[in-house]
Curated annotation (Swiss-Prot):
Gene Ontology annotations for the cellular component aspect, listed alphabetically: chloroplast
Compartment(s) of residence: Plastid, Chloroplast
Keywords tagged on the record: Chloroplast, mRNA processing, Plastid, RNA-binding, tRNA processing
Protein function: Usually encoded in the trnK tRNA gene intron. Probably assists in splicing its own and other chloroplast group II introns.
Entry coiled-coil feature ranges: none
Stated family: Belongs to the intron maturase 2 family. MatK subfamily.
Taxonomic classification: Eukaryota, Viridiplantae, Streptophyta, Embryophyta, Tracheophyta
Record's protein name: Maturase K
Gene label: matK
Pfam families to which the protein is assigned, alphabetical: Intron_maturas2, MatK_N
Residue ranges crossing the lipid bilayer per the database entry: none
Domain of life: Eukaryota
Presence of the UniProt keyword Plastid in the record: yes
Organism from which the protein derives: Phaulothamnus spinescens (Snake-eyes)
């Protein structure tokens, strides 16, 4: 037990730092808008893990001299056309952005210290959304059931403050956090909406993204097991959650989880190979076990959230599905495990017989109906999928119109490049190409056929990805190798987040 308790002990060196005085430094807001800053330079030296307020003040002062996003007193007359309400919202938003940066500082240093202590190399591939799907392909073929979980959110804003209170001992900063939460009451935007793309409100996005990830990782860390066959609630490896939007871990052994704060022993169910994956507000827990075991996991999670985090989760927010019978709606794909049968004729001497081979295959299918609905909402087509002109773009230049359509088409091609069936993707690309042609024809008061005849093949090349352009130069389009490459699945490890299609302008 002492060994477990040693793992749970926190590094108190940074908890005594007070962040509240930085709120009154106007330079901190230049820091808030400089997202490219490498926070590792906040360490005083290479061998010291302590965070320095002096270094932070020097950095934000230097950035302020090159940043013009800060409103000064001289700008008050220029901003009089803003109403009082708009000014209040603008200033409060800037303060919340600065507060988010200040709170992120110690957790960023904790992440760096954790990675260095474990000698873990930070790989950009781990941050990619697509890195989850190769994990599915490798593991799900051997699993039976999956829990489809909508992560609950606190019913009261004070729960967020209490969660952060364990780590931040600055009472003034916590009071300021309460002010932001009760001022805007944006926590409802963290619930699971109908459109999976939207989870956080655009206002105060950085602050609420941090609070949401921090709150989730508090109870999510119980699923993270150390390699030395022990586990504790506040694992040192939880810091990876602060950097990535998604997280997956593997449970390997049944252990006693000692929780210093709760003062109780939590027992996990004996299960050798469950796998956990989360992206934004949705998570899945896949297992090789039986249906009874998955029902135990379901009610364990419900009672765990209610008893220890005061979070109400209804049973209907957790679905138990058998992988061989149901598709998993996750991250814009319908994923399933299906049986792929093939018959082989074998000849042995004078006897011939047929061998029926059954192979498990992981399928990722594009949800064509919801995607056409998104295109219809963005005015690229009607609800039936027939392309229409984008009238609001007719005032733009021809090159801008083609560039916008081409960028959306390329983004969709990259994201859905891992689909098992490319027919739906080709239909989406056809809708965008014809919508672009109709928009240009409407602008020039011409017909689509005449406009396409004038532009020729150069118009279609704008919608090709870089990979498709290279393949068209190397291989003939009708060759067998080319067709196999076009039908193949590709996962791009440079995709970090999903952008809203309608606002990708």
């Amino acid at each position: 037990m002492e060994e477990f308790q040693g793992h749970i002990e926190l590094d108190r060196s940074w908890q005594d730092n007070f962040f509240y005085p930085l709120i009154f430094q106007e330079y901190i807001y230049a820091f808030a808008y400089d997202h490219g800053l490498n926070k590792s330079i906040l360490l005083e030296n290479a061998g010291d893990k302590k965070y320095s307020l002096l270094i932070v003040k020097r950095l934000i002062t230097r950035m302020y001299q090159q940043n013009h996003l800060i409103l000064s007193a001289n700008d008050s007359n220029q901003n009089e056309f803003f109403g009082h309400k708009h000014k209040k919202n603008l200033y409060s938003q800037m303060i919340s952005e600065g507060f988010a940066v200040i709170v992120e500082i110690p957790f960023s240093l904790l992440l760096i210290s954790s990675l260095e202590g474990k000698e873990i190399v930070k790989s950009p591939n781990l941050r990619s959304i697509h890195s989850i799907f190769p994990f599915f392909e490798d593991k799900f073929l051997h699993l039976n059931y999956v829990l489809d979980i909508l992560i609950p959110y606190p019913a009261h804003l004070e729960i967020l403050v209490q969660t952060l209170r364990y780590w931040v001992k600055d009472a003034s900063s916590l009071h300021l956090l309460r002010f932001f939460l009760y001022e805007y009451r944006n926590w409802n935007s963290l619930s699971i909406p109908k459109e999976s793309i939207y989870i956080f409100s655009k206002r105060n996005q950085r602050l609420f993204l941090f609070l949401y990830n921090f709150h989730v990782c508090e109870y999510e860390s119980i699923f993270v097991f150390l390699r030395n066959q022990s586990s504790h609630l506040r694992s040192t490896s939880f810091g990876a959650l602060l950097e990535r939007i998604h997280f997956y871990g593997k449970l390997e052994y049944l252990v006693n989880v000692f929780t210093k704060d709760f003062g109780v022993i939590l027992w996990l169910f004996k299960e050798p190979f469950p796998h956990y994956v989360r992206y934004q507000g949705k998570s899945i827990l896949a297992s090789k076990g039986t249906s009874l075991l998955m029902h135990k996991w379901k009610y364990y999670l419900i009672h765990f959230w209610q008893c220890h985090f005061s979070v109400w989760s209804q049973p209907r927010r957790i679905y138990i599905n058998r992988l061989s019978n149901h598709s998993l709606d996750f991250m814009g794909f319908f994923s399933s495990v299906r049986l792929n049968s093939s018959v082989v004729r074998s000849q042995m001497l004078e006897n011939s017989f047929l061998i029926d081979n059954t192979i498990m295959k992981f399928d990722t299918i594009i949800p064509i109906i919801p995607l056409i609905g998104s295109l219809a909402k963005a005015k690229f087509c009607n609800v039936l999928g027939h392309p229409i002109s984008k009238s609001v773009w007719t005032d733009l230049s021809d090159s801008d119109i083609i560039d916008r359509f081409g960028r959306i088409c390329k983004n969709l091609s990259h994201y859905y490049s891992g689909s098992s069936r490319k027919k739906s993707l080709y239909r989406i690309k056809y809708i965008l190409r014809l919508s672009c042609a109709r928009t240009l024809a409407r602008k020039h008061k011409s017909t689509v056929r005449a406009f396409l005849k004038r532009l020729g093949s150069e118009f279609l090349e704008e919608f090709f990805t870089e990979e498709e352009k290279v393949l068209s130069l190397i291989l003939p389009r009708d060759s067998f190798t080319s067709r196999e490459l076009y039908r193949g699945r590709f996962w791009y490890f440079d995709i970090i987040c999903i952008h809203n299609l309608a606002n990708d302008e």
